[in-house]
Amino acid sequence: MIIKEYISGISTIGVLSLSTEKFGLAPYFAEENTINKFKKVLDVPVKALNIGNSSLIGALCCANSYGIILPPFTLNREKTILSDFLKENDIDIIVKEINAKNTAFGNLILLNDKGCIISEELADFRKTFEDIFDVEVVAKNIAELPTVGSNGVATNKGALVHPDTTDEELELIKDVLKLKCIERGTASKGTPSVGACIVANSNGAVIGGDTTGPEMLKIEEGLDLID
């Protein structure tokens, strides 16, 4: 299933939220109706919270079914909310704060449950991320950009990436993340940073409300969501 949605009128929903195969996170100000749509489409429990008093959950955090990394300025009460949510839903994963120079982890990491590509800016943390996410981690910029997370979205089934991604980079992503499907594309009326506009897992995708019909079709193809 794939639907278009705004979060309080904002189309760049991937900056504000994230999803794995086990759970989703959304900003504290997200309306209950929006949260319910996320739950239905992604078929996972979803929690609304802030990280570091910020609503930029998808930009600051990164997760798969084995672990989640948080910026070092995450507040204790936010960590408690997250921990309680995971326990309530019997989700046993590693939760780790990472003290890096650039803490926009969601913008810098593209991963699923099979592999992970990180920005070259985070190369020193490759082994740390392998231990947390329990997958192979490769440091590589994509489309000559360090923001591999905001310029791509990946699930265990497929991926959509920045339109300037080269053929060689497509093959690398496909190989590292062990994917059958991958496509180049845009979202939200031509935005190349597709990860900033899409929240997805293998069950479905919620895409920014400004996304056009042709973009939606390419997203469905890349994420292997066409029935």
From Swiss-Prot:
GO terms for molecular function: ribosome binding; translation initiation factor activity. SUPFAM superfamilies: Pentein. The keyword Nucleotide-binding does not apply. Gene3D superfamilies: L-arginine/glycine Amidinotransferase, Chain A. GO terms for biological process: cytosolic ribosome assembly. Belongs to the eIF-6 family. Binds to the 50S ribosomal subunit and prevents its association with the 30S ribosomal subunit to form the 70S initiation complex. This is Translation initiation factor 6. The lineage of its organism: Archaea, Methanobacteriati, Methanobacteriota, Methanomada group, Methanococci. The gene is eif6.
